[in-house]
Amino acid sequence: MSRRGSILHSRTQWLLLGLALLFSLVLFMYLLECAPQTDGNASLPGVVRENYGKEYYQALLQEQEEHYQTRATSLKRQIAQLKQELQDMSEKMRALQERKKLGANGVGYPGNREQAPSDLLEFLHSQIDRAEVSVGAKLPSEYGVVPFESFTLMKVFQLEMGLTRHPEEKPVRKDKRDELVEVIEAGVEVINNPDEDDAQEDEEGPLGEKLIFNENDFIEGYYRTERDKGTQYELFFKKADLMEYRHVTLFRPFGPLMKVKNELIDITRSVINIIVPLAERTEAFSQFMQNFRDVCIHQDKRIHLTVVYFGKEGLSKVKSILESVSSESDFHNYTLVSLDEEFNRGRGLNVGARAWDKGEVLMFFCDVDIYFSAEFLNSCRLNAEPGKKVFYPVVFSLYNPAIVYANQDVPPPVEQQLVHKKDSGFWRDFGFGMTCQYQSDFLSVGGFDMEVKGWGGEDVHLYRKYLHGDLIVIRTPVPGLFHLWHEKHCADELTPEQYRMCIQSKAMNEASHSHLGMMVFREEIEMHLRKQAYRTNSETAG
């Protein structure tokens, strides 16, 4: 027994020494890769010695810097993996030693400890078999296909853009960048260290050496996700001086569902302080109060309304509307704050948030053009938590009813316009004005930026404060929140950036792509109809 233990101890030492040497080698390669080039006469790759502009060299340097950053990240990840493997191996050897000692004392082990990892591995392999990787699936229509999105080392080409993303862009989220870098590294590893069952022969270079691929040999890739199975990656590599491509297919299977939390949430006593900044627009406020009375007073009954009014014109009308609703519905949970100054949405919401002095409260920052349901108010309560979560719902913005319902004599009532259709509106995924958050969280981040004047911008500033903090931001489209169409006026006093945002919002608010197209080609359509009518009349007369 002692001899066997000494042999095991000796093997453990050699194994740890080997892993340490391998770690040192990778670290040495990383230092060489990151070391600056000292050859001052060497030209940049692909650059002919001509007079180029400053922008050209800046773009080239930025591209090189991004390449080296990607490579450095790759090497750092490999070092971290080696450290983890070294630690895992040490723990395994330590556990083996402990088992040996316990076994000598006659202590037995249950035989099913390895059963769970084995079952999990079997499940993950079954996910590959279920996915549409090797064999196609029978689909009901052309819309059943899950399309791929393509990517290169620097760009992603995507189909689902919403209103804020671009057809071609660099991955903004760090997790997406890391995912694609990891996939390319895994593809390189598969090519350079093939399994015995891989149907490929080792390629040789011009001098007979084994070809070693790296990230720079990556040409393009495609990926798609089947929500219940996993993500499939198709990768293509090619050496610059060779005609053959190397194709690698990878699959990241989704594991079984795991319980994270099971809790009871009591929202029966949760009061929402709805804060509405307002200037003039008394007719819109009257319509808003109709929705408020139906939803908040008659159904929800756990609401406080705070209206922050700017200026003197229209103030008496707003007071009259509030008093009328109060007397008709016996509702007194409202506050009217009057500010004799120029309208500033951020300023109004700041004042409205601080006007509440009855302890912690959930706030809903709302505009006078918003229509919401009782179900949305409960979503507001469920998705905001003090010190943990803020809720930023995506509003469904309705198009101009005069265009949407142009074939009708008059547009239908507002309640009948609240439908989620492509020609009736769009998800306003570039807007961050409607939000549910607790007063303490709002005050802890400093509220709105008072330097932002006029239209837009202050919402994004507040949103970014939460993104840069520790709170979870819940961002999702919700069915019970609508932005009613109203004509926009972009003031000349706005900054160029604010004016651009205002015009962009105005254009997107007007009508769908198909309706705008019909308006552009209206004369051509009318001419076609006249020709058709003339031809029909001629044939009838003949």
From Swiss-Prot:
Listed GO biological process terms: chondroitin sulfate proteoglycan biosynthetic process; dermatan sulfate proteoglycan biosynthetic process; proteoglycan biosynthetic process
Q: Where does a divalent metal cation bind?
A: D369, H486
Q: Which residues form a coiled coil?
A: 59-105
Q: Which reaction does it catalyse?
A: 3-O-(beta-D-GlcA-(1->3)-beta-D-Gal-(1->3)-beta-D-Gal-(1->4)-beta-D-Xyl)-L-seryl-[protein] + UDP-N-acetyl-alpha-D-galactosamine = 3-O-(beta-D-GalNAc-(1->4)-beta-D-GlcA-(1->3)-beta-D-Gal-(1->3)-beta-D-Gal-(1->4)-beta-D-Xyl)-L-seryl-[protein] + UDP + H(+)
The domain of life for this entry's organism is: Eukaryota
Provide the membrane topology annotation.
Single-pass type II membrane protein
Briefly state the protein's biological role: Transfers 1,4-N-acetylgalactosamine (GalNAc) from UDP-GalNAc to the non-reducing end of glucuronic acid (GlcUA). Required for addition of the first GalNAc to the core tetrasaccharide linker and for elongation of chondroitin chains.
Name of the featured protein:
Chondroitin sulfate N-acetylgalactosaminyltransferase 2
Which gene name does the record give? Csgalnact2
